Swiss-Prot record:
Protein name stated in the entry: Protein DOWNSTREAM OF FLC
Gene name of the record: DFC
InterPro entries listed in its UniProt record: Allergen_Ole_e_I_CS (IPR006040), Pollen_Ole_e1_allergen (IPR006041)
Locations listed in the record: Secreted
Role, per record: Part of a three-gene cluster containing FLC, UFC and DFC, which is coordinately regulated in response to vernalization. Not regulated by FLX.
Family indicated by similarity: Belongs to the Ole e I family.
UniProt keyword annotations, A-Z: Disulfide bond, Secreted, Signal
Signal sequence extent: 1-23
Domain of life: Eukaryota
Organism: Arabidopsis thaliana (Mouse-ear cress)
Induction behaviour: Epigenetically down-regulated by vernalization.
A Pfam family hit: Pollen_Ole_e_1
Length: 164
Protein backbone atom coordinates (compact mmCIF):
# COMPACT_ATOMS: atom_id res chain seq x y z
CA UNK A 1 0.00 0.00 0.00
CA UNK A 2 2.76 2.46 0.98
CA UNK A 3 4.67 1.66 -2.22
CA UNK A 4 1.75 2.87 -4.33
CA UNK A 5 2.00 6.38 -2.83
CA UNK A 6 5.74 6.76 -3.46
CA UNK A 7 5.42 7.74 -7.17
CA UNK A 8 2.60 10.18 -6.37
CA UNK A 9 4.63 11.87 -3.63
CA UNK A 10 7.69 12.03 -5.90
CA UNK A 11 5.67 13.72 -8.66
CA UNK A 12 4.19 16.23 -6.21
CA UNK A 13 7.65 17.11 -4.88
CA UNK A 14 8.95 17.68 -8.41
CA UNK A 15 5.96 19.90 -9.26
CA UNK A 16 6.31 22.03 -6.11
CA UNK A 17 10.08 22.53 -6.46
CA UNK A 18 9.91 25.24 -9.20
CA UNK A 19 7.31 27.17 -7.21
CA UNK A 20 9.50 27.14 -4.11
CA UNK A 21 12.54 28.21 -6.12
CA UNK A 22 10.60 31.07 -7.70
CA UNK A 23 9.38 32.30 -4.30
CA UNK A 24 12.92 32.37 -2.92
CA UNK A 25 14.30 34.32 -5.89
CA UNK A 26 11.42 36.78 -6.19
CA UNK A 27 12.28 40.16 -4.66
CA UNK A 28 10.04 42.03 -2.27
CA UNK A 29 8.73 45.35 -3.59
CA UNK A 30 8.51 48.03 -0.91
CA UNK A 31 6.45 51.16 -1.57
CA UNK A 32 6.04 54.26 0.56
CA UNK A 33 5.98 58.04 0.53
CA UNK A 34 7.87 60.99 2.02
CA UNK A 35 6.28 64.32 2.90
CA UNK A 36 7.03 67.74 4.35
CA UNK A 37 4.88 68.46 7.41
CA UNK A 38 4.25 72.11 6.57
CA UNK A 39 2.34 72.76 9.82
CA UNK A 40 4.60 70.69 12.13
CA UNK A 41 1.59 68.69 13.36
CA UNK A 42 3.31 65.30 13.27
CA UNK A 43 0.86 63.82 10.74
CA UNK A 44 -0.33 64.32 7.17
CA UNK A 45 -2.90 67.05 6.49
CA UNK A 46 -4.40 68.81 3.49
CA UNK A 47 -1.44 71.23 3.71
CA UNK A 48 1.12 68.41 3.46
CA UNK A 49 3.63 68.70 0.62
CA UNK A 50 4.99 65.43 -0.80
CA UNK A 51 8.72 65.60 -1.51
CA UNK A 52 10.30 64.84 -4.88
CA UNK A 53 13.92 63.64 -4.68
CA UNK A 54 13.94 62.57 -1.02
CA UNK A 55 16.32 59.69 -0.28
CA UNK A 56 15.22 56.61 1.66
CA UNK A 57 17.08 53.46 2.67
CA UNK A 58 15.97 50.01 3.82
CA UNK A 59 18.05 48.63 6.70
CA UNK A 60 17.65 45.21 8.35
CA UNK A 61 19.03 44.34 11.78
CA UNK A 62 19.68 40.79 12.91
CA UNK A 63 17.90 40.21 16.23
CA UNK A 64 20.69 37.97 17.58
CA UNK A 65 23.93 39.67 16.46
CA UNK A 66 22.38 43.18 16.22
CA UNK A 67 24.36 43.66 12.99
CA UNK A 68 22.69 46.08 10.55
CA UNK A 69 22.72 45.61 6.79
CA UNK A 70 21.72 48.08 4.08
CA UNK A 71 19.45 46.13 1.72
CA UNK A 72 17.98 48.86 -0.49
CA UNK A 73 17.94 52.55 -1.38
CA UNK A 74 15.39 54.67 -3.22
CA UNK A 75 14.62 58.22 -4.32
CA UNK A 76 11.07 59.58 -4.36
CA UNK A 77 9.39 60.56 -7.60
CA UNK A 78 7.30 63.66 -8.41
CA UNK A 79 4.44 62.46 -6.19
CA UNK A 80 6.72 61.83 -3.19
CA UNK A 81 6.46 58.05 -3.57
CA UNK A 82 9.30 55.57 -3.71
CA UNK A 83 9.60 51.95 -4.77
CA UNK A 84 12.50 49.67 -3.98
CA UNK A 85 13.11 45.98 -4.70
CA UNK A 86 14.78 43.96 -1.95
CA UNK A 87 16.15 40.48 -2.59
CA UNK A 88 16.19 37.74 0.00
CA UNK A 89 13.94 36.60 2.82
CA UNK A 90 14.95 38.41 6.01
CA UNK A 91 13.06 35.93 8.24
CA UNK A 92 13.31 37.21 11.81
CA UNK A 93 15.34 40.34 11.07
CA UNK A 94 13.87 43.72 11.97
CA UNK A 95 13.73 45.84 8.81
CA UNK A 96 13.04 49.56 8.61
CA UNK A 97 12.59 52.13 5.88
CA UNK A 98 14.56 55.19 7.06
CA UNK A 99 14.67 58.81 5.92
CA UNK A 100 18.10 59.82 4.63
CA UNK A 101 17.77 63.27 3.03
CA UNK A 102 15.26 65.90 1.98
CA UNK A 103 16.12 68.13 -0.99
CA UNK A 104 13.88 70.92 0.38
CA UNK A 105 16.05 73.48 2.19
CA UNK A 106 13.19 74.57 4.48
CA UNK A 107 12.16 71.00 5.31
CA UNK A 108 15.25 69.18 6.61
CA UNK A 109 14.34 68.11 10.17
CA UNK A 110 13.12 64.51 10.30
CA UNK A 111 9.96 64.06 12.37
CA UNK A 112 11.15 61.78 15.21
CA UNK A 113 7.81 59.97 15.24
CA UNK A 114 7.68 59.48 11.46
CA UNK A 115 11.35 59.11 10.43
CA UNK A 116 11.22 55.30 10.10
CA UNK A 117 8.65 52.71 9.06
CA UNK A 118 8.71 48.98 9.74
CA UNK A 119 8.73 46.78 6.65
CA UNK A 120 8.11 43.03 6.63
CA UNK A 121 10.56 41.14 4.43
CA UNK A 122 9.66 37.49 4.96
CA UNK A 123 7.46 34.91 3.32
CA UNK A 124 6.99 33.09 6.64
CA UNK A 125 4.19 35.33 7.91
CA UNK A 126 1.34 34.12 5.72
CA UNK A 127 1.33 37.13 3.37
CA UNK A 128 1.16 35.89 -0.22
CA UNK A 129 2.11 39.16 -1.92
CA UNK A 130 5.64 40.34 -2.57
CA UNK A 131 4.38 43.96 -2.56
CA UNK A 132 4.57 45.59 0.87
CA UNK A 133 3.64 49.11 1.89
CA UNK A 134 5.60 51.19 4.39
CA UNK A 135 3.92 53.94 6.40
CA UNK A 136 4.54 57.48 5.16
CA UNK A 137 7.59 59.21 6.62
CA UNK A 138 8.02 62.94 7.09
CA UNK A 139 10.24 65.93 7.60
CA UNK A 140 9.22 69.04 9.56
CA UNK A 141 9.18 72.43 7.83
CA UNK A 142 11.40 75.00 9.62
CA UNK A 143 8.48 77.37 10.24
CA UNK A 144 4.79 76.46 9.94
CA UNK A 145 2.88 77.95 7.03
CA UNK A 146 0.35 80.70 7.60
CA UNK A 147 -3.07 79.25 8.16
CA UNK A 148 -1.88 76.28 10.21
CA UNK A 149 -3.68 77.51 13.36
CA UNK A 150 -6.99 77.53 11.47
CA UNK A 151 -6.18 74.11 10.06
CA UNK A 152 -5.47 72.78 13.56
CA UNK A 153 -8.96 73.89 14.63
CA UNK A 154 -10.42 71.79 11.81
CA UNK A 155 -8.58 68.71 13.08
CA UNK A 156 -9.47 69.16 16.76
CA UNK A 157 -12.52 67.54 18.28
CA UNK A 158 -15.58 69.79 18.45
CA UNK A 159 -15.09 72.49 21.07
CA UNK A 160 -11.63 71.24 22.13
CA UNK A 161 -9.63 74.45 21.65
CA UNK A 162 -7.43 74.02 24.74
CA UNK A 163 -4.56 72.62 22.66
CA UNK A 164 -4.27 75.80 20.59
Amino acid sequence: MAKSFVPLIAVLCVLVLPLAAMAVGTPFHIEGSVYCDTCRFGFETIATQYIRGARVRIVCKDRVTLKSELVGVAVTGPDGKYKVAVRGDRQDQQCLAELVHSPLSRCQEADPGRSTATVILTRSNGAASTRHYANAMGFFRDEPLRGCAALRKRYLADGDNRAI
